Regions:
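M16/insulysin-pitrilysin zinc metalloprotease superfamily fold
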Residues: 92, 116, 120-185, 257-259
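M16/MPP (pitrilysin/insulinase) zinc-metallopeptidase core fold and M16-derived inactive scaffolds
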Residues: 88-92, 96-115
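An aromatic/glycine/proline-enriched structural segment found at the starts
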Residues: 6-78, 91-96, 237, 241-259
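Short amphipathic beta-strand starts and helix->beta connectors
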Residues: 49-51, 113-121, 216-222
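Short, flexible turn/loop "capping" segments at secondary-structure junctions
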Residues: 1-3, 58-61, 124-130, 201, ...
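C-terminal regions of mature proteins
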Residues: 6-8, 173-259
Length: 259
């Protein structure tokens, strides 16, 4: 229906011409009897339940693991703090020549002990909730527990107080990633449309920069305690999963500070 559609123009587009094209091509679309305003959720918030799915495939040379907690929705005030938290732990790939020198503390641990081929943290938001976690690939099947253990220990460290230096570094990396990604009309149009559908408004690059700059170490500690500390996790694993320990053993690492 027309109320579920967003038409965006970016670049050298005349507003009047865009309106004429919209009337020509989309004026026939029906309108819902009870239209939902953009950015509003018509359903009850989803409930996150900790669980796991493992698919063993011994023909694979690697084990692929995703671990996530419930994250922040698009409209949550914790949206940007959770993105900064994701940036603190970052991504790592052993194929990078500078991988042992990357600023993420977790990358040093993984690189030094050859625990994984790569890892990537993510913060995925939806209209009512989100997923925050990590995706890991490893061919070191006998040390999967170490990889998971040290990853979750780093998560818990954020709950006790991240350093101001790593928070500032993560904020700079996040701003560069978000703002430099708007490098063309296609990316800008996609960004405008996504924000309008999910939040009902568009945050300008300046507003995004202000929101990220306002995140403090205390704010990171707060969201880490809210979303990570002793929270249930969802695990999905495929490949050589025989070295991945029991769910309850992994879940216990969400509330212990023992290295």
């Amino acid at each position: 229906t027309a109320d579920r559609m967003v038409l965006v123009g970016a670049g050298g587009v005349e507003h009047e011409e865009l309106v004429k094209l919209a009337e020509k091509h989309f004026s026939h679309l029906p309108v819902a009897q009870n239209p939902i305003r953009l950015g509003e959720n018509q359903y009850e918030p989803s409930r996150f339940v900790g669980s796991e799915v493992r698919v063993r495939d011994d023909t694979s040379s690697t084990c692929n693991i995703a671990i996530a907690v419930e994250g922040a929705s698009w409209k949550s005030p914790d949206y940007y703090p959770m993105l900064v938290l994701q940036s603190i732990f970052g991504n790592w790939d052993r194929s990078l020549g500078s991988s042992p020198l990357m600023s993420s503390r977790l990358s040093h641990i993984v690189s030094t002990n050859n625990l994984a081929n790569s890892f990537m943290h993510f913060s995925t938001s939806y209209s009512d909730t989100g997923l925050w976690g990590v995706y890991m690939v490893s061919e070191n099947h006998m040390n999967l527990d170490d990889m998971v253990h040290f990853t979750l220990k780093e998560w818990q460290r954020a709950s006790t107080g991240p350093s101001p230096a790593e928070v500032e570094r993560a904020k700079s990396q996040l701003k560069a990633s978000l703002l430099l990604g708007l490098d063309g009309t296609t990316a800008i149009a996609e960004d405008i449309g996504r924000q309008l559908i999910t939040t009902g408004k568009r945050a300008t690059p300046q507003e995004i920069e202000v929101a990220i700059n306002s995140v403090t170490p205390a704010e990171i500690q707060r969201v880490a305690q809210k979303y990570i500390w002793d929270k249930d996790i969802a695990i999905a694993a495929t490949g050589r999963v025989e070295g991945l320990l029991d769910y309850n053993r992994i879940r216990a690492d969400m509330s212990t500070l023992i290295y």
